From Swiss-Prot:
Residues 110-120 are annotated as: Interaction with host STAT1. Belongs to the paramyxoviruses V protein family. GO terms for biological process: symbiont-mediated suppression of host cytoplasmic pattern recognition receptor signaling pathway via inhibition of IRF7 activity; symbiont-mediated suppression of host cytoplasmic pattern recognition receptor signaling pathway via inhibition of MDA-5 activity; symbiont-mediated suppression of host JAK-STAT cascade via inhibition of host TYK2 activity; symbiont-mediated suppression of host JAK-STAT cascade via inhibition of STAT1 activity; symbiont-mediated suppression of host JAK-STAT cascade via inhibition of STAT2 activity; symbiont-mediated suppression of host type I interferon-mediated signaling pathway. The keyword Nucleotide-binding does not apply. Residues 146-160 have a biased composition (Acidic residues). This is Non-structural protein V. GO terms for cellular component: host cell cytoplasm. GO terms for molecular function: metal ion binding. It comes from Measles virus (strain Edmonston-AIK-C vaccine) (MeV).
Length: 299
Protein backbone atom coordinates (compact mmCIF):
# COMPACT_ATOMS: atom_id res chain seq x y z
CA UNK A 1 0.00 0.00 0.00
CA UNK A 2 2.85 2.37 0.78
CA UNK A 3 4.45 1.66 -2.59
CA UNK A 4 1.18 2.38 -4.37
CA UNK A 5 0.78 5.69 -2.54
CA UNK A 6 4.38 6.62 -3.29
CA UNK A 7 3.80 5.95 -6.97
CA UNK A 8 0.73 8.21 -6.94
CA UNK A 9 2.65 10.99 -5.18
CA UNK A 10 5.58 10.88 -7.58
CA UNK A 11 3.39 10.81 -10.68
CA UNK A 12 1.25 13.65 -9.38
CA UNK A 13 4.28 15.82 -8.59
CA UNK A 14 5.76 15.31 -12.04
CA UNK A 15 2.47 16.24 -13.70
CA UNK A 16 2.12 19.35 -11.54
CA UNK A 17 5.67 20.43 -12.41
CA UNK A 18 4.89 19.93 -16.09
CA UNK A 19 1.72 22.01 -15.89
CA UNK A 20 3.52 24.79 -14.01
CA UNK A 21 6.34 24.84 -16.56
CA UNK A 22 4.05 24.97 -19.60
CA UNK A 23 0.36 25.54 -18.79
CA UNK A 24 -2.34 24.42 -21.17
CA UNK A 25 -2.60 26.85 -24.06
CA UNK A 26 -5.94 28.24 -25.19
CA UNK A 27 -5.12 27.26 -28.79
CA UNK A 28 -4.69 23.61 -27.85
CA UNK A 29 -7.98 23.63 -25.95
CA UNK A 30 -9.82 25.22 -28.88
CA UNK A 31 -8.38 22.66 -31.31
CA UNK A 32 -9.38 19.80 -29.03
CA UNK A 33 -12.90 21.16 -28.69
CA UNK A 34 -13.21 21.62 -32.44
CA UNK A 35 -11.97 18.10 -33.12
CA UNK A 36 -14.42 16.64 -30.63
CA UNK A 37 -17.35 18.51 -32.11
CA UNK A 38 -16.49 17.10 -35.54
CA UNK A 39 -16.63 13.46 -34.41
CA UNK A 40 -19.39 13.72 -31.80
CA UNK A 41 -21.99 12.57 -34.34
CA UNK A 42 -19.86 9.62 -35.58
CA UNK A 43 -17.85 8.17 -32.67
CA UNK A 44 -17.01 5.03 -34.65
CA UNK A 45 -14.37 6.89 -36.62
CA UNK A 46 -12.39 7.99 -33.54
CA UNK A 47 -9.78 5.22 -33.52
CA UNK A 48 -9.24 5.24 -37.28
CA UNK A 49 -8.82 9.02 -37.37
CA UNK A 50 -6.32 8.88 -34.54
CA UNK A 51 -4.17 6.29 -36.29
CA UNK A 52 -4.18 8.29 -39.51
CA UNK A 53 -2.92 11.36 -37.67
CA UNK A 54 -0.11 9.40 -36.00
CA UNK A 55 1.09 8.05 -39.37
CA UNK A 56 2.27 11.45 -40.64
CA UNK A 57 4.14 14.35 -39.10
CA UNK A 58 1.32 16.69 -40.01
CA UNK A 59 -0.81 15.09 -37.31
CA UNK A 60 1.28 16.58 -34.53
CA UNK A 61 -0.59 19.86 -34.58
CA UNK A 62 -3.96 18.19 -33.89
CA UNK A 63 -5.03 16.19 -30.87
CA UNK A 64 -5.52 12.47 -30.97
CA UNK A 65 -9.27 12.10 -31.55
CA UNK A 66 -9.54 8.87 -29.60
CA UNK A 67 -8.19 10.67 -26.56
CA UNK A 68 -10.87 13.35 -26.44
CA UNK A 69 -13.96 12.97 -24.30
CA UNK A 70 -16.70 15.17 -22.92
CA UNK A 71 -15.96 18.53 -21.30
CA UNK A 72 -16.74 19.74 -17.79
CA UNK A 73 -16.08 23.20 -16.42
CA UNK A 74 -14.39 24.34 -19.61
CA UNK A 75 -11.61 21.72 -19.35
CA UNK A 76 -11.50 19.10 -22.14
CA UNK A 77 -11.67 15.45 -21.27
CA UNK A 78 -9.77 12.59 -22.86
CA UNK A 79 -10.55 8.94 -23.19
CA UNK A 80 -7.87 6.34 -22.42
CA UNK A 81 -7.98 2.58 -22.61
CA UNK A 82 -5.45 0.82 -20.42
CA UNK A 83 -5.15 -2.82 -19.45
CA UNK A 84 -8.53 -3.80 -18.08
CA UNK A 85 -10.08 -0.40 -18.86
CA UNK A 86 -13.08 0.23 -21.12
CA UNK A 87 -13.38 2.75 -23.94
CA UNK A 88 -15.95 4.71 -21.93
CA UNK A 89 -13.52 5.72 -19.16
CA UNK A 90 -13.33 9.50 -19.64
CA UNK A 91 -10.14 11.06 -18.32
CA UNK A 92 -8.95 14.61 -17.74
CA UNK A 93 -7.11 16.21 -20.68
CA UNK A 94 -3.75 17.91 -20.12
CA UNK A 95 -0.61 18.95 -21.94
CA UNK A 96 2.82 17.27 -21.39
CA UNK A 97 6.05 19.15 -20.65
CA UNK A 98 6.55 19.75 -24.42
CA UNK A 99 4.46 21.82 -26.80
CA UNK A 100 2.44 20.06 -29.44
CA UNK A 101 4.52 21.60 -32.22
CA UNK A 102 7.82 20.81 -30.47
CA UNK A 103 7.05 17.14 -29.90
CA UNK A 104 8.77 14.78 -32.32
CA UNK A 105 7.00 11.59 -31.29
CA UNK A 106 3.32 12.54 -31.23
CA UNK A 107 0.69 14.01 -28.98
CA UNK A 108 1.16 13.27 -25.31
CA UNK A 109 -1.91 13.07 -23.09
CA UNK A 110 -2.50 13.53 -19.37
CA UNK A 111 -5.12 11.55 -17.49
CA UNK A 112 -6.14 10.64 -13.94
CA UNK A 113 -7.26 7.34 -12.41
CA UNK A 114 -8.43 6.59 -8.92
CA UNK A 115 -7.70 3.31 -7.13
CA UNK A 116 -10.69 1.59 -8.74
CA UNK A 117 -9.81 2.70 -12.27
CA UNK A 118 -12.60 5.29 -12.50
CA UNK A 119 -12.08 8.73 -13.96
CA UNK A 120 -11.12 11.47 -11.51
CA UNK A 121 -12.19 15.07 -12.04
CA UNK A 122 -9.64 17.82 -11.69
CA UNK A 123 -5.99 17.95 -12.65
CA UNK A 124 -4.70 18.20 -9.09
CA UNK A 125 -6.53 15.05 -7.98
CA UNK A 126 -3.30 13.46 -8.64
CA UNK A 127 -2.53 9.84 -9.20
CA UNK A 128 -1.81 10.85 -12.77
CA UNK A 129 0.62 9.45 -15.31
CA UNK A 130 2.28 11.08 -18.31
CA UNK A 131 2.01 8.80 -21.34
CA UNK A 132 2.86 9.07 -25.01
CA UNK A 133 0.31 8.57 -27.76
CA UNK A 134 2.89 7.94 -30.48
CA UNK A 135 3.17 4.20 -29.74
CA UNK A 136 2.15 1.23 -31.83
CA UNK A 137 -1.20 -0.52 -31.74
CA UNK A 138 -3.54 -0.07 -28.81
CA UNK A 139 -0.81 1.10 -26.44
CA UNK A 140 -1.76 4.73 -27.12
CA UNK A 141 -3.15 5.48 -23.69
CA UNK A 142 -2.30 2.39 -21.71
CA UNK A 143 -2.31 2.95 -17.98
CA UNK A 144 -4.47 2.84 -14.93
CA UNK A 145 -4.42 0.82 -11.73
CA UNK A 146 -3.25 -2.32 -13.48
CA UNK A 147 0.14 -0.71 -13.99
CA UNK A 148 0.81 -1.21 -10.31
CA UNK A 149 1.08 -4.92 -10.99
CA UNK A 150 4.18 -4.22 -13.09
CA UNK A 151 5.89 -2.09 -10.49
CA UNK A 152 8.67 -4.66 -10.12
CA UNK A 153 9.69 -4.46 -13.81
CA UNK A 154 13.05 -2.79 -14.43
CA UNK A 155 13.55 -0.02 -16.99
CA UNK A 156 13.82 -1.39 -20.50
CA UNK A 157 12.04 -4.65 -19.84
CA UNK A 158 8.64 -5.18 -21.49
CA UNK A 159 5.55 -5.10 -19.33
CA UNK A 160 2.67 -7.58 -19.45
CA UNK A 161 1.31 -5.92 -22.60
CA UNK A 162 4.63 -6.30 -24.44
CA UNK A 163 5.63 -2.63 -24.57
CA UNK A 164 8.92 -1.36 -23.24
CA UNK A 165 8.72 0.90 -20.23
CA UNK A 166 11.28 3.27 -21.80
CA UNK A 167 8.92 4.07 -24.66
CA UNK A 168 6.49 6.00 -22.49
CA UNK A 169 6.87 9.72 -23.06
CA UNK A 170 9.80 11.99 -23.70
CA UNK A 171 10.67 11.82 -19.97
CA UNK A 172 9.97 8.17 -19.08
CA UNK A 173 8.86 7.23 -15.59
CA UNK A 174 10.39 4.16 -14.03
CA UNK A 175 7.70 1.79 -12.82
CA UNK A 176 10.25 0.02 -10.61
CA UNK A 177 10.56 2.73 -7.99
CA UNK A 178 9.62 2.21 -4.39
CA UNK A 179 8.39 4.42 -1.58
CA UNK A 180 12.00 5.36 -0.79
CA UNK A 181 12.39 6.81 -4.32
CA UNK A 182 9.78 9.55 -3.85
CA UNK A 183 11.17 13.05 -4.26
CA UNK A 184 9.21 16.27 -4.08
CA UNK A 185 9.72 19.44 -6.07
CA UNK A 186 11.41 21.04 -3.07
CA UNK A 187 14.14 18.40 -2.80
CA UNK A 188 14.89 15.00 -1.34
CA UNK A 189 13.67 15.49 2.22
CA UNK A 190 10.97 12.84 1.91
CA UNK A 191 13.43 10.50 0.20
CA UNK A 192 15.84 10.79 3.12
CA UNK A 193 13.06 10.42 5.68
CA UNK A 194 11.72 7.25 4.10
CA UNK A 195 15.24 5.85 3.84
CA UNK A 196 15.85 6.39 7.54
CA UNK A 197 12.48 4.88 8.43
CA UNK A 198 13.18 1.80 6.34
CA UNK A 199 16.55 1.35 8.04
CA UNK A 200 15.03 1.84 11.48
CA UNK A 201 13.46 -1.61 11.37
CA UNK A 202 16.78 -3.34 10.64
CA UNK A 203 19.20 -1.56 12.97
CA UNK A 204 18.97 -0.97 16.72
CA UNK A 205 18.11 2.55 17.75
CA UNK A 206 20.96 4.57 19.16
CA UNK A 207 20.71 6.58 22.34
CA UNK A 208 20.00 5.97 25.98
CA UNK A 209 17.91 3.01 27.00
CA UNK A 210 15.95 2.62 30.20
CA UNK A 211 17.19 -0.36 32.16
CA UNK A 212 14.37 -1.63 34.32
CA UNK A 213 15.58 -3.71 37.27
CA UNK A 214 14.08 -7.17 37.62
CA UNK A 215 11.39 -7.70 40.24
CA UNK A 216 12.71 -8.71 43.65
CA UNK A 217 12.79 -12.35 44.54
CA UNK A 218 10.31 -13.07 47.35
CA UNK A 219 12.51 -15.90 48.59
CA UNK A 220 15.41 -13.53 49.21
CA UNK A 221 13.38 -10.86 50.98
CA UNK A 222 14.99 -9.92 54.23
CA UNK A 223 12.79 -10.41 57.22
CA UNK A 224 13.26 -8.31 60.31
CA UNK A 225 13.80 -10.17 63.53
CA UNK A 226 11.84 -7.61 65.53
CA UNK A 227 8.07 -7.98 65.60
CA UNK A 228 5.78 -5.27 64.26
CA UNK A 229 5.02 -2.66 66.89
CA UNK A 230 1.48 -2.91 68.06
CA UNK A 231 -0.69 0.16 68.33
CA UNK A 232 -2.29 2.74 66.06
CA UNK A 233 -1.03 4.89 63.22
CA UNK A 234 -2.31 8.32 62.23
CA UNK A 235 -3.60 8.75 58.65
CA UNK A 236 -4.36 12.13 57.12
CA UNK A 237 -6.14 12.97 53.84
CA UNK A 238 -5.90 16.44 52.26
CA UNK A 239 -8.27 17.59 49.51
CA UNK A 240 -7.68 20.91 47.77
CA UNK A 241 -10.36 22.30 45.45
CA UNK A 242 -8.64 25.55 44.47
CA UNK A 243 -9.85 27.91 47.19
CA UNK A 244 -9.97 25.77 50.30
CA UNK A 245 -8.36 22.70 51.84
CA UNK A 246 -10.25 19.84 53.48
CA UNK A 247 -8.38 17.67 55.98
CA UNK A 248 -9.51 14.30 57.30
CA UNK A 249 -7.58 12.67 60.17
CA UNK A 250 -8.11 9.26 61.66
CA UNK A 251 -6.26 6.33 63.21
CA UNK A 252 -6.00 2.70 62.12
CA UNK A 253 -4.38 -0.34 63.75
CA UNK A 254 -0.75 -0.89 62.84
CA UNK A 255 -1.47 -4.42 61.62
CA UNK A 256 -4.03 -3.27 59.03
CA UNK A 257 -3.14 -2.70 55.39
CA UNK A 258 -2.60 0.87 54.25
CA UNK A 259 -5.07 1.71 51.46
CA UNK A 260 -6.00 4.86 49.60
CA UNK A 261 -9.01 6.65 50.96
CA UNK A 262 -10.65 7.38 54.28
CA UNK A 263 -10.97 3.81 55.53
CA UNK A 264 -11.39 2.72 59.14
CA UNK A 265 -9.74 -0.66 59.36
CA UNK A 266 -9.98 -3.31 62.02
CA UNK A 267 -7.23 -5.02 63.95
CA UNK A 268 -6.20 -8.35 62.43
CA UNK A 269 -3.71 -9.46 65.06
CA UNK A 270 -5.91 -8.98 68.08
CA UNK A 271 -3.12 -7.23 70.02
CA UNK A 272 -3.62 -3.59 69.04
CA UNK A 273 -5.35 -1.39 71.63
CA UNK A 274 -8.97 -0.64 70.91
CA UNK A 275 -8.59 3.04 71.77
CA UNK A 276 -5.71 5.20 70.54
CA UNK A 277 -4.20 7.40 73.21
CA UNK A 278 -3.58 10.14 70.66
CA UNK A 279 -7.22 10.11 69.61
CA UNK A 280 -8.34 10.88 73.13
CA UNK A 281 -7.06 14.47 73.03
CA UNK A 282 -7.45 15.15 69.26
CA UNK A 283 -10.77 16.82 68.61
CA UNK A 284 -10.25 16.70 64.83
CA UNK A 285 -10.30 12.93 64.53
CA UNK A 286 -13.25 11.64 62.51
CA UNK A 287 -14.25 15.24 61.78
CA UNK A 288 -13.54 17.00 58.50
CA UNK A 289 -11.73 20.31 59.00
CA UNK A 290 -11.49 22.86 56.20
CA UNK A 291 -9.25 25.91 55.83
CA UNK A 292 -9.59 28.81 53.40
CA UNK A 293 -5.87 29.47 53.15
CA UNK A 294 -2.88 27.18 53.38
CA UNK A 295 -1.12 29.26 56.11
CA UNK A 296 -4.05 28.57 58.40
CA UNK A 297 -3.16 24.88 58.54
CA UNK A 298 -1.35 24.15 61.82
CA UNK A 299 2.03 22.50 61.54
Amino acid sequence: MAEEQARHVKNGLECIRALKAEPIGSLAIEEAMAAWSEISDNPGQERATCREEKAGSSGLSKPCLSAIGSTEGGAPRIRGQGPGESDDDAETLGIPPRNLQASSTGLQCYYVYDHSGEAVKGIQDADSIMVQSGLDGDSTLSGGDNESENSDVDIGEPDTEGYAITDRGSAPISMGFRASDVETAEGGEIHELLRLQSRGNNFPKLGKTLNVPPPPDPGRASTSGTPIKKGHRREISLIWNGDRVFIDRWCNPMCSKVTLGTIRARCTCGECPRVCEQCRTDTGVDTRIWYHNLPEIPE
